[in-house]
Amino acid sequence: MKRYEIRWAALDPASGAEMAKTRPVVIVSLDVLNERLETVTVCPLTSQLHPGWRTRLAVKTGRRRAEIAVDQIRTLSKSRLGRKLGSLSEDEARSLRRLITEMYGE
């Protein structure tokens, strides 16, 4: 499991306004952590587009448009992750790093 891979993840059970169900997520934790820990930090993807939200990053996955929900960042057990769907482009990864830094600091 590598940083910026997109994988299926089972997010249930969820609580309150947390994103739920099985959906794609982007791994955002560092590869050194991904290799050593039993958990990964991810941002879920959603097809519910909100172009004006500064907490979301628009990406194209296959033929569909989606948004990476940086406001829904969370740590999951690796056992919740399924097959790899793809990876972010270098430009998308750079934009995601910038947005995470804007939201959560350096």
Question: What is the meaning of each model-derived region?
Answer:
Residues 1-106:
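Conserved functional hotspots at enzyme active or ligand-binding sites that engage polyanionic ligands
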